[in-house]
UniProtKB/Swiss-Prot annotation:
PANTHER family: FES CLUSTER ASSEMBLY PROTEIN SUF, UPF0051 PROTEIN ABCI8, CHLOROPLASTIC-RELATED. Part of the SufBCD complex that contains SufB, SufC and SufD. The SufBCD complex acts synergistically with SufE to stimulate the cysteine desulfurase activity of SufS. The SufBCD complex contributes to the assembly or repair of oxygen-labile iron-sulfur clusters under oxidative stress. May facilitate iron uptake from extracellular iron chelators under iron limitation. GO terms for biological process: iron-sulfur cluster assembly. Pfam families: SUFBD_core, SufBD_N. Disulfide bonds: none annotated. InterPro entries: Fe-S_cluster_assembly_SufBD, SUF_FeS_clus_asmbl_SufB, SUF_FeS_clus_asmbl_SufBD_core, SUF_FeS_clus_asmbl_SufBD_sf, SufBD_N. SUPFAM superfamilies: Stabilizer of iron transporter SufD. This is Iron-sulfur cluster assembly protein SufB. NCBIfam families: PRK11814.1, sufB.
Amino acid sequence: MSRNTEATDDVKTWTGGPLNYKEGFFTQLATDELAKGINEEVVRAISAKRNEPEWMLEFRLNAYRAWLEMEEPHWLKAHYDKLNYQDYSYYSAPSCGNCDDTCASEPGAVQQTGANAFLSKEVEAAFEQLGVPVREGKEVAVDAIFDSVSVATTYREKLAEQGIIFCSFGEAIHDHTELVRKYLGTVVPGNDNFFAALNAAVASDGTFIYVPKGVRCPMELSTYFRINAEKTGQFERTILVADEDSYVSYIEGCSAPVRDSYQLHAAVVEVIIHKNAEVKYSTVQNWFPGDNNTGGILNFVTKRALCEGENSKMSWTQSETGSAITWKYPSCILRGDNSIGEFYSVALTSGHQQADTGTKMIHIGKNTKSTIISKGISAGHSQNSYRGLVKIMPTATNARNFTQCDSMLIGANCGAHTFPYVECRNNSAQLEHEATTSRIGEDQLFYCLQRGISEEDAISMIVNGFCKDVFSELPLEFAVEAQKLLAISLEHSVG
């Protein structure tokens, strides 16, 4: 069931075509990969490769059986052909070449440096080319995920001194079993939806984070997801728990090689925030967007946070510039009294990209507050949709929501769509909703051109100003990166 590719030191970069996507290289290396297809034996094989206990296998099998009873959804404001799930491989990892590769998943296989047997010289070279530090040096902790496995996690020992757990999901299953069993599937059940059920059945490595009571995480935590193998899907499972009176800021980034066929990314993120705790969760999404309506990543993700305790706070911030189709709604369940949910989003589509993204704010506790700031930019022949739900439950006395949804059109062939849903079951609630749709004005462009600014630079400046409310919520270095990605995505959208 495994496949080996000749291992070389060569890291090949894709430079062809009009698309400027410098992350589109692929890395040649030996891989341990399951044959294409999904069935109960494949689910068992994934669990066996990861040396998982019986309870985790049962979680997978229950989700797989639920998934078989579900139908693939197509209600989004975008089109994709029905996927052949037998045409994907559901496990791919760098191979050491000496065994069946389960050694890197065994308890104790992770070295003090945070690296394991999956971190080959080819994998390290790939992350170096991406600018992702898999060795300690920069003051940001990184969990590097390559296809189905975590290959390195930095600053684990330093964080452990304060009781912070920062490790791969696979390692957490072995070393922090009680915590994983306590929280796994509590926010996103294994049968939550079609793609969440698929994820639960074939889940690959994501990141597990636990911040103990009264601890403020001393550095940014981050995960970088890299898809390398062809005809594989990535199905990471991430769990983040902030105990009482704690704080953590977490960032994720991603990229994939240029391929001429779709690849599936169906992740699940569960965040649990206890009393007086705060979590900031930032995403800079840069999956391969496809080229001339060919290939790209299908980014079908379920992200959900539970503000369990009083005065808890969750902030989602996302910059979405990649993937052929983006379909995700990072959500907050505001159960604790006085809890706060925030959603800040920039979604840019160009070329033939399609996006249907937004958020859900579910108010349950008293005096809960939510803020939604969404900026959508459409260029080329793309379609960009915002879809949001604000739900005020009967118990949510004095709940408040503010929603601002702005769309910008660049060119005559793109589209922007808005689908706001409001359900209010408590008459003490206050809800505000603002929405605008605009084009870049000719007078704005003329003003810039008269001052020697090129048309592309002028559009980039105007769009960055349009998005400043969201970029200001990102950590500084990631805000700069998000602005660069925005400019690159707009390069061929003028005219």
